[in-house]
């Protein structure tokens, strides 16, 4: 079974299978190449991806996905149970094969192999992701990668938590919405909270 077909054996990261770009990367012979390139260029500009765009898209999609592993690891300070760790390791081994295949197919691509977007937005902790999925020597079973990814989710979160430095309450819609551009607030800029500042300092 090749790595693209093997992706359908994912247990935790199954939502990746419904991503149109991931599906196009899985079935390169079924998609018109310029159509896929167009989708990837749009994604690169919207997400601020740079470098080998299909690879960067996959790394971003993997850590942005909300699933039981990402939610439990973030909620429990990076600690998960043995059963969940085995399931995550299973998926990581499968994703490694696919990520490696995509890397090799696109690393020398004239358009997508070394792309620079209009506005670059670095993916937090990208070097950890590269270590987990591309440079995994000595971790054939994926267990070390699970520990690193638990730490990643604990440090950075997943989904919207990765993309926003701050959050504000949207009273009309009654939910937290991400704020990408916010001013840095320091104690000397706060007025009327002298008692609270004393307690915190």
Label every model-predicted segment:
Residues 1-138:
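Intrinsically disordered, low-complexity N-terminal extensions of AAA+/P-loop NTPases
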Residues 19, 141-144, 186:
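Poly-acidic low-complexity segments
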Residues 113-176:
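Interdomain "pre-motor" coupling segment immediately N-terminal to P-loop NTPase/helicase cores
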Residues 133-136, 175-199:
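Dynamic helix-loop-helix/coil hinge segments at AAA+ ATPase domain boundaries and subdomain interfaces
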């Amino acid at each position: 079974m090749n790595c693209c077909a093997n992706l359908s054996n994912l247990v935790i990261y199954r939502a990746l299978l419904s991503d149109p770009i991931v599906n196009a990367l899985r079935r390169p012979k079924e998609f018109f190449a310029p159509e896929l390139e167009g989708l990837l260029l749009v994604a690169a500009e919207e997400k601020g991806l740079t470098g080998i765009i299909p690879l960067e898209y996959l790394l971003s999609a993997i850590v942005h996905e909300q699933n039981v592993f990402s939610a439990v690891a973030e909620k429990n300070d990076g600690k998960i149970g043995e059963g969940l760790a085995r399931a995550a390791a299973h998926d990581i081994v499968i994703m490694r094969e696919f990520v490696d295949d995509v890397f090799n197919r696109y690393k020398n691509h004239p358009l997508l192999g070394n792309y620079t977007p209009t506005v670059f937005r670095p993916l937090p902790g990208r070097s950890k992701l590269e270590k987990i999925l591309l440079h995994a020597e000595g971790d054939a079973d994926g267990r070390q990668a699970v520990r690193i990814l638990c730490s990643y989710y604990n440090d950075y979160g997943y989904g919207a938590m990765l993309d926003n430095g701050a959050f504000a309450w949207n009273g009309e819609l009654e939910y937290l919405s991400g704020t990408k551009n916010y001013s840095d607030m320091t104690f000397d800029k706060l007025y009327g909270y002298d008692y609270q500042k004393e307690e915190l300092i």
